[in-house]
Amino acid sequence: MMPCSRWNRVALLAGLSVMLAGCGSASRNLASNKGLSGGLWSMRVTSPVLSEGQPIPPKYTADGDNVSPPLKWSHGPSGTSEYVLIVEDADSDRKIPAMHWMVYRLPVGTNELPENAAATGNLIQGRNYKGQNTYTGPDPKKGNTHHYHFQIFALDQSITLPPGATRPELGQALKRGAIAKGKLVATYTR
C-alpha cells in the first residue's frame, strides 16, 4: 500500500474537481480517474456474488429482484473515520456516469453490507440517477454491455451530509477527506 502525501492529495483533488465538473473524458467515474490512483491507499472490494469483469447476476439488476448485492471491503488505513460506497455505470449515455447507489457515513468498524442492505432503512443513502435514495440495479439498453464500478472510499473525516445528497455534494466530501479507495468492476448486458 502507498501512503497519501499532501502533494498527492492535491493532485487527487484537482483530478476529482475536473471529473465532478462533468468534463468529458474516457475515465468519468470517481475511482477510475488516473489522478486518483497516486497517493491513496488501496483497498480491496469483494462479493460472494460478483467477480471482477464478470456479469452481474440478474437478481441484482432491474431485470430481476433489483436488490443490492452483498459487498465486503478491506479495512482502511489508520486514521479512517468512515466509509463511502458508490456504485456507478461507467458506460451510461449521460455526460457523467449514472449513479446507481451512494451510501455514506458508514462507521469505521463496518467492512461489509449484506444482500438487500439498501432496503433495510439503516443506511444513509444519496440520490441515485432516478432521484431515489436507494439502490437501483443495472438497466442498460438492449444489446449493450455496461461496466458497473462498486467503489469504496475511506475518509479521514466525517461527512455531515443528510440523506439524499447529490453526486456533486458527495464528491466535495470525497475531495476533502478520501485517503483510500478500492473497487470491483462487474458487467451487465441485456
Model features per residue range: what roles?
Residues 2-12:
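Bacterial N-terminal signal peptides that target proteins for export
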